[in-house]
C-alpha cells in the first residue's frame, strides 16, 4: 500500500475518474448540475472522446456549476489530488470561472477573483484555479481556509500549451483545453499545476480535516458562453480520521 493510505486493505486510496463518455451525465449518483435561468446545465456534448458542457446567458452573475459528493479529505492519508481538463467555449472576455475543490453542493461560485485580483469567498473551505475575464491575465491559484482567504497567486510559470509551444501565459483561450491539477498535502498546503507544469504553492490553502468535493463553476458577464470538461479526477487516502 502506498504511504498514507489505509493499511488494512489493498485498496488504500479512494479514487474517481469520470471521462464523460456515457450517454448522459450521471446526475443521480455522481454529479449535481445546477443552473440559473437562461443557462444550460452541464450535460454530455457529443464530441470526440466525450465531454460535458454547461452554458450561461448574458445576464450578469448567472451561475452554472457541477459538483460531486463531499467525501474527500486531505488528512486521510493524502495527498488529495483533483484534476480537471477544461476549455472555455465561445468567449473568455468576461465572467468568472472556478475549477477545483469546495466544501458543499451549494449552488454557488466557491471563490471568485475581481478584475483587480481581490478574492471573494462563498465557500468556507475551497481550493482551486480562478479566472476573471476582463481582469488581469492568467489563471490565479486560490484558497480559503476556515473562512480566511489566502492571497491569490498568479500562475505564470513556463508550461507547454495545447499547440506544443512553451509559454508563461496561462490565460485560457477559447476552445483550447487545459489540464488543471491541484495537490493538497496533509498539512493543507496546496500545489497547482497546468498541463503538468508546476505553477504555484499556497501554504494552508484549505483545512485538511474538512470534507471536500470536486467543483466546476462559472458566472456570466455580459457575454453568453460555455465551458467544456473533458474529464474529472479525484483521489485521496482511505485512512479514517483519528
How would you describe each model-predicted region?
Residues 96-99, 204-242:
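Ligand-recognition surfaces built from glycine- and aromatic
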Residues 1-35:
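Extracellular carbohydrate-recognition regions
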Residues 53-145:
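Secretory/extracellular carbohydrate-interaction modules
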Residues 20, 82-84, 175-185, 190-192:
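Short tryptophan-centered beta-strand motifs in secreted/extracellular beta-sheet-rich domains
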Residues 86-88, 184, 234:
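Hydrophobic beta-strand positions in extracellular immunoglobulin-like domains
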Residues 193-197:
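Short strand-turn-strand beta-turns centered on an Asx-Gly dipeptide
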Residues 145-179:
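Short, aromatic/His-centered strand-loop micro-motif at the edge of beta-sheets
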Residues 26-53:
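Extracellular glycan-recognition surfaces and repeat-rich motifs
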